[in-house]
Regions:
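Active-site loop/lid in soluble adenylation, ligation, and acyl-transfer enzymes
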Residues: 2-123
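A structural motif
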Residues: 123-142
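A long amphipathic alpha-helix within ATP-dependent nucleotide-binding catalytic cores
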Residues: 144-148
Length: 148
């Protein structure tokens, strides 16, 4: 599949989204930018965009193999992927294996502490509210998820 990449539609902390010649397909470009503390701390992590692109694509392809539809269309190169244009759900899923960032402040756990079991967290992606943590009841009540 070959789509002509057009104007930028969106730029966030981790990626840029571009329109293509097909109105149902967009191109996602993964950046090396890194932020912390509600964007107060900014930096660059070499090849972060490559890792994020490759990992995201591997996960989407695995889901597709299991019969779960995704937005994945085609990896273009190390940083860019064509995906179906979708409505973004403002929900962040966080899986922690090691204590880092805000978790250490909230829970009083030393940075680098390895957990006996992974910790699953959800946050409501809203910059004005500083991405508050929510549970599945919030996600259902706010229409961010369904029981299925």
């Amino acid at each position: 599949m070959n789509y002509e990449v057009k104007e930028q539609m969106y730029e966030g902390k981790a990626k840029q989204v571009f329109a293509t010649s097909d109105p149902e397909i967009v191109m996602v470009h993964y950046k090396d930018d890194a932020t912390a503390g509600d964007g107060e701390k900014k930096g660059t992590i070499r090849d972060k965009g490559i890792v994020n692109n490759k990992l995201s694509n591997a996960l989407m392809q695995k889901l597709e193999k299991e019969g779960i539809p995704t937005h994945y269309v085609q990896e273009i190169n190390d940083r860019d992927t064509f995906v179906k244009k979708v409505e973004i759900v403002p929900l962040e899923v966080i899986i922690r294996n090691v204590a880092a960032g805000h978790f250490t402040l909230r829970m009083g756990v030393p940075e680098g502490t390895e957990f006996k079991t992974p910790i699953l967290e959800f946050s409501y992606k809203n910059d004005d509210l500083h991405d508050p943590f929510i549970n599945h009841y919030y996600a259902l009540a706010l229409g961010l998820a369904t029981q299925e």
